Design a protein with these regions (language model features):
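Feature marking well-ordered beta-strand scaffolds used for ligand recognition
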Residues: 1-443
Length: 443
């Protein structure tokens, strides 16, 4: 241990964490934070009746600042980082990286164009549906979208509502949003609504999945070709090979008693299972999920609302919003207690290592920064690659890896026939006994 005295004090205080920051209260008519997402120097929050607000957290680790979380470092005349709404419930960024589609590109770098949807933030409102946050492109050409959050220029710190989308009230009761490629997966009273953000100022619904497939859905997370959704019954799996049209995978279900939200980390899904603590589900075979273990730290996890995971050195941790029981940190594995920690996805050996008492119920935990994420589910580049002109596969190139004629390309353990030339159309290849005999060409 690097700091034995600090650790000894930590143990004496029963592993209780300290906080050196005064709670920040919203000034827009609401004080509850229903959702939060950190990106760069700002934390984006959905505040119920308080609408949406962006907090300046640039000095969170600076000892020279006494107030480390502020709504604005200047007067209201110089900054407006909030958007009013009737009842804001959730907020999402297309990526946790600082991707700016409005940034000027040098042609010599041979960079791909960044999709416009990355220039906005996306929130849900209980009554208004989907709220697109950012300045309108036509009205604010100098700082359109939310580019002001990324450009480092303090002279343009103003953000407004760019669009509102709730056709025929289909998004009423919207309470959770997850971005996958150019699609938003929104949970609402009707179930799961898939919304295309290909034109972010003119969204459109491409699919709806409601009862009896989904019953009061609470959380959704996406990994490669699958979406994992929690509802009143537990965890369910959807095939999203076609992002705009999710399909339920028959039998891919894990029954749970109080599922509130889900987070994915490689081959495991971590479900906030309310009064039952945290459910750890093996999703190595996504169409055949199975419960790996339930963990409640001997009853200390008793109102689990949300779980996010993160890595520090060679150890993995789960950060748990445990409702009325406060905030908890669970060590999932470390070199000390798991000899398989070097693997791609070590089996979790969870143990509670720290806790923090909150004045109100702990509801949500921000997702950390994505590491090594070069491309999204729709083939849009997210990261700068090492060489000029280097890029990931685009969508069509990705599909060629695992799709044939619109269907998923699979293989069998036993060869179905003789090898064929990969450049020869399959229809032109015939087995020897099917070839015509007696023709002049058969010599």
């Amino acid at each position: 241990i690097a700091y034995p005295k600090n650790y000894e004090e930590f143990q004496k205080h029963k592993r209780e964490l300290d906080a050196d920051e005064h709670p920040v209260r919203a000034k827009l008519g609401g004080e509850e934070v229903l959702d939060i997402q950190l990106r760069g120097e700002y934390a984006y929050a959905a505040l119920g009746k308080g609408g949406f607000r962006f907090y300046d957290v640039a000095q969170i680790d600076n000892k020279d600042f006494s107030e480390k979380i502020v709504t604005a470092p200047v007067s209201p005349f110089g900054q407006k980082f909030y958007v009013k709404s009737k009842y804001a419930t959730a907020i999402a960024t297309p990526t946790t990286l600082g991707v700016d589609p409005l940034r000027r590109h040098d042609p010599q770098n041979e960079e791909q164009q960044i999709h416009l949807m990355y220039g906005f933030l996306y929130g849900t409102d209980k009554y208004e549906g989907l709220v697109v946050l950012g300045n309108n492109l036509k009205e604010k050409k100098d700082f359109a979208g939310v580019g002001t959050l990324l450009d480092g220029n303090p002279a343009n710190n103003f953000v407004r509502r760019a669009a509102t989308f709730n056709p025929d009230g289909k998004l009423n009761g919207a309470r959770r949003i997850t971005i996958a490629g150019v699609y938003a997966y929104i949970l609402c009273d009707r179930g799961l609504e898939v919304v295309s953000l290909d034109d972010p100022l003119h969204p459109k619904i491409t699919a709806e999945i409601g009862s009896p497939v989904l019953n009061e859905p609470t959380g959704v997370a996406v990994q490669f070709r699958y979406a994992f959704v929690t509802d009143k019954e537990g965890l369910k799996v959807f095939d999203i090979t076609h992002l705009d049209q999710p399909k339920l995978v028959d039998g891919a279900k894990v029954l749970l008693g109080d599922a509130r939200n889900v987070y994915l980390a490689r081959t495991y899904a971590y479900v906030a299972d309310g009064k039952d603590g945290m459910a750890i589900i093996d999703i190595e075979r996504p169409e055949h999920p199975k419960l790996a273990q339930m963990f409640n730290a001997n009853g200390e996890l008793r109102d689990t609302r949300d779980v996010k995971t993160g890595m520090v050195s060679s150890s993995q941790f789960a950060f748990v919003a445990d409702g009325e029981a406060g905030f908890k940190i669970v060590q999932l594995f470390s070199p000390v207690d798991n000899d398989k920690f070097y693997g791609f996805s070590p089996p979790p050996t969870p143990k509670l290592i720290a806790r923090y008492k909150t004045k109100g119920p702990a509801l949500i935990v921000s997702e950390g920064t994505d590491r090594d994420r070069g491309v999204d589910e729709s083939g849009n580049q997210l990261s700068v690659f090492g060489r000029r002109g280097a890029r990931p596969f685009n969508q069509q190139e990705m599909l060629r890896m695992y799709m044939r004629n619109g269907e998923l390309y699979t293989v069998t353990n036993a060869p179905p026939g003789r090898p064929v030339d990969s450049h020869t159309p399959l229809k032109a290849v015939e087995e020897p006994d099917q070839q015509k005999k007696g023709s002049g060409e058969d010599k």
